[in-house]
Amino acid sequence: MEKYHSNSRFAPFRDAPFALRGALGSSGSSFSSIDSLRRSSTLEQARGYTSRPLGAVRPKMLPSGCRPLHTSHPLSAPVANRPLSPHLPLKKPQLSATFSISHRIFGAALGAAIISIPLATKFSLMFDV
């Protein structure tokens, strides 16, 4: 264990858990240039996670009126803070949904009519109505 404390490659990661030292300080990987850029933030994250109990990770708070974006490039401020869905009159009506709903309504009405006519006939003959 002392060889890791004296090794210069692991020197910045003395406070990180032993299991994370290899992942944080691997210089033989093809991503070593990217790793060197992210070492300070990764080390701060590792220290932050180990200083709290498991499951007590601090949630990232967003300012009021902002929402997280699932994009790889930054967006301008007006685009990033626009509402999640526009007003309904701005949308074009979806004909497939309209046809589906009307088809179900007319199908239920037709089915009720087909079933009710024989039932009405049977009960009218049965009760001499």
UniProtKB/Swiss-Prot annotation:
The chain crosses the membrane at residues 105-127. Residues 25-35 have a biased composition (Low complexity). Heme binds at H87. Its cofactor is heme. Residues 25-80 are annotated as: Disordered. One of its GO terms (molecular function) is electron transfer activity. It is a single-pass membrane protein. One of its GO terms (cellular component) is respiratory chain complex II (succinate dehydrogenase). Keywords: Electron transport, Heme, Iron, Membrane, Metal-binding, Mitochondrion, Mitochondrion inner membrane, Transit peptide, Transmembrane, Transmembrane helix, Transport, Tricarboxylic acid cycle. Pathway: Carbohydrate metabolism; tricarboxylic acid cycle. One of its GO terms (biological process) is tricarboxylic acid cycle. SUPFAM superfamilies: Fumarate reductase respiratory complex transmembrane subunits. This is Succinate dehydrogenase subunit 3-1, mitochondrial. The lineage of its organism: Eukaryota, Viridiplantae, Streptophyta, Embryophyta, Tracheophyta. The gene is SDH3-1.
